[in-house]
Design a protein with these regions (language model features):
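Conserved beta-loop-beta/alpha segment of the NTase-like Rossmann-fold superfamily
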Residues: 78-149, 153
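Conserved beta-strand segments of alpha/beta enzyme cores
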Residues: 25, 48, 70, 174-176, ...
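Residue-level signal for inorganic ion chemistry
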Residues: 10, 23, 35, 88, ...
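N-terminal glycine-rich phosphate-binding loop and ensuing alpha1 helix
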Residues: 3-55
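Short beta->alpha connector loops at strand-helix junctions that form conserved
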Residues: 30, 72-77, 178-179
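Short glycine-rich anion-binding loops that position phosphate/pyrophosphate groups of nucleotides
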Residues: 14-16, 56, 77, 106-109
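Conserved alpha/beta core of the MobA/IspD/sugar-nucleotide pyrophosphorylase nucleotidyltransferase superfamily
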Residues: 1-8, 157-204
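Conserved N-terminal catalytic core of the sugar/cofactor nucleotidyltransferase
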Residues: 36-100, 114
Length: 204
């Protein structure tokens, strides 16, 4: 089994329940669906990328399958983000040996390759610690969050919709905060109104 320093798990198995019938990951920005938009940025980093999707989904899978990312089908994805993370990590560790994994939702429209790279470089200054971005001057935390290998077993056991938050809280002294003014780590779009307002701001 080949060892890798880091891999990337992109979470795209959510139901977009707050979008009132629309799939936020298929919403187009400059003619590109959001899921493809963030994938393009992550894939520029040239390390293995995995994407969780609902097992019954076809549209998201169709977009992802045209890239070099590996699709992980999540059964019972309605059980929440924690379940998707656990399924994703479980599948990844069957076939790959990563020293760390970055985990990130797919609904961050402003996240770019450069920002991800800055976070990864910061993580490798203390690669035994969990690393997450924190908005400078506030308590706002963002994504991706990078976990060393020693947390993979815990990640495989989480459930519910709180994601990996409980693991981070339980290991507060082992968390390396990346303090930043870069808003792209923190902005996600969950409702039609948020999406519309973001488009207005972006387009001036």
């Amino acid at each position: 089994m080949i060892k890798y320093k880091i891999g990337f798990l992109l979470l795209a198995a959510g139901s977009s329940s707050r979008m009132r019938g629309k799939d936020k990951l298929l919403q187009e920005i400059d003619g590109v669906p959001q899921i493809e938009r963030i994938l393009r940025q992550v894939l520029k980093l040239r390390f293995p990328v995995f994407v969780t999707v609902p097992a019954t989904d076809t549209k998201r899978k169709s977009i992802i399958s045209k890239t070099k990312a590996t699709i992980i089908e999540v059964h019972n994805s309605k059980l929440g983000m924690g379940h998707s993370i656990a399924e994703g990590i479980g599948e990844i560790t069957k076939n790959y040996d990563f020293l760390s994994l970055a985990i990130c939702p797919s609904d961050l429209p402003d996240l770019k390759m450069g920002s991800i790279n800055h976070l990864i470089n910061y993580f490798f200054k203390s690669p035994e610690m969990i690393c997450r971005p924190v908005a400078r001057g506030s308590a706002n935390v963002g994504h991706p969050v990078i976990f060393p290998k020693k947390y993979f077993e815990e990640l495989k056991s989480i459930r519910g919709d709180s994601g990996a938050r409980n693991i981070v809280q339980k290991n507060k002294t082992a968390v390396n905060q990346y303090n930043t003014y870069d808003a792209s780590y923190f902005l996600d779009l969950d409702t039609p109104e948020e999406f519309t307002n973001w488009m207005k701001r972006t387009n001036g």
